[in-house]
Amino acid sequence: MRSQPSPGWRDGIDAAPWAPSATRDALRLRAWLNRLVREFFHARQVLEVETPILSAAGNTEPNIDGFQTRFSGHVDAGTPLRWLRTSPEYPLKRLLAAGVGDCYELGRVFRNGEAGGRHNPEFTMLEWYRVGWDHLRLADEAVELVQQALSLVGRNAEVVSTTYRELFVQDAGVDPFTASDEKLQAPLREFGIEGEGLSRDDWLDLLMTHRIQPDFPADRITVVHDWPASQCALAKIRQPVAGSGEPAVAERFELYLGRFELANGYHELTDAAEQRARFLSDNRVRAGRGAVQPPLDEHLLAALAAGLPDCAGVALGIERLLMAMLGTERIAEVLAFDFARA
């Protein structure tokens, strides 16, 4: 997919500060990927929608920080303090509750706190929802989309699907549900991690990012499903059969291409009271860390109370997918202008 640069084009991240951080080829690939995404969902009769980027509510997830801004004009309805969305999830669910059916959005989202390497505060997210599906069926569709994307660069990938428990036992030698905290920490000693204040889930995340994920083969799509209930986020929790001795699990999956985490999907929680409790729990964690506690999304909670249909949803990072397709570790190489050049 080589193309001839136009006169004056400064190609790539090492060019002058005013010039693009991506090559022309990378920008073309992004355009082709956007077209592929839209054709993929058009063929499946999934409706493209656009939802607000500014919201009166923020994301309470303890490990995600949002940007705040203030409207300077006259406002009769609602607070002038607004949040840039970290995902389109909440308004998309409101559309689902209103009866829009299967839908997706391809648009910009914003997350505060990290820039450089694999991260940019502004990036593109693809998020879609399927009514009547669970997380496993949606994972299959996400795999199909990634495989089609790989065809744009003449690549293909084998697919491995595993439970969270199977993955940790096989690749780290520990059972994530029953191992002691000491056993979880043992494989990470060589990294010299300061453990003060880290929770069990933090150690599990570190095992994934430091010991397991780096060994995923570059030409393999790995789907990891049925996560610990403590990492449920906005997913349903499946209780075990009585007397089975099995743990409760979150009906959630993550999808990786090589070492790149691309997508995070849920069999969506539909219970408004439980969702409110999770939001409040998130904000208690944030308060303990001295972090901002965003206002809850009361519109979402009202939509859940009105009736969110049984559905599954997934968010996929477009830049991460492009990076994995091109084999680069720098997000700047797939952005016209990264944060430093914006």
Model-predicted segments: where are they?
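Short, conserved secondary-structure transition motifs
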Residues: 157-175
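Acidic, low-complexity central loop/insert segments
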Residues: 134-160
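Short, charged, low-complexity patches
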Residues: 30, 135-139, 272
